């Protein structure tokens, strides 16, 4: 009983601390534009990463205290590795990429991981695998386009395929939890 009460207090405190950390993260998204000094900007962007990982840790610590299953901690560690890999690979492969955009992408992924893990662990694992695959593709596509110049000339084809795919979701998509998110092709969800 005492352990459970302590866990509840920690979880409640973590909720408020996460709100404060998200506010600090958001504030730094705007303040980074106020500095011309590259070192100061890098410090702010690195601090954003620290804030993001603190939010991530607090959320998963709270889930672990509530659920008490080791799989939550393992899944947390996998996500940390994925997020670190994204930050490092994007800045290494694309040194001119906006670090703020990369940070915001990782922050949104973190929030998504937290939300879906709270709802369904199995769906969260599936989503994490999809996110890792999407990141791998997003890292490879620009390199491939640079190597095969003709691919960059097919913009209208990509646009058309995207519009047709979105229209297919609207027309034949199956509704789950009030949203049409995809459709089935030969028993495979798209």
Task: Locate predicted features.
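Hydrophobic transmembrane alpha-helical segments in integral membrane proteins
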Residues: 5-21
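Membrane-helix boundary/helix-loop-helix interface segments in multi-pass membrane proteins
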Residues: 8, 39-190
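N-terminal signal-anchor/start-transfer transmembrane helix
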Residues: 16-33
């Amino acid at each position: 009983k005492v352990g459970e009460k302590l866990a509840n207090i920690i979880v409640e405190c973590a909720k408020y601390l996460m709100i404060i950390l998200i506010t600090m993260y958001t504030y730094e998204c705007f303040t980074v534009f106020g500095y011309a000094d590259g070192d100061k900007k890098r410090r702010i962007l690195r601090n954003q990463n620290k804030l993001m990982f603190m939010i991530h840790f607090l959320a998963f610590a709270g889930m672990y205290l509530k659920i008490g299953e080791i799989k939550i901690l393992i899944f947390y560690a996998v996500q940390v590795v994925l997020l670190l890999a994204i930050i490092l690979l994007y800045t290494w492969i694309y040194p001119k990429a906006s670090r703020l955009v990369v940070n915001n992408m990782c922050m949104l992924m973190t929030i998504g991981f937290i939300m879906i893990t709270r709802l369904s662990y199995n769906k969260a694992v599936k989503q994490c695998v999809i996110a890792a695959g999407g990141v791998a593709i997003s890292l490879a596509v620009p390199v491939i386009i640079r190597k095969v110049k003709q691919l960059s000339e097919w913009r209208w084809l990509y646009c058309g395929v995207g519009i047709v795919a979105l229209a297919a979701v609207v027309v034949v998509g199956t509704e789950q939890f009030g949203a049409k998110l995809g459709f089935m092709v030969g028993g495979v969800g798209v």
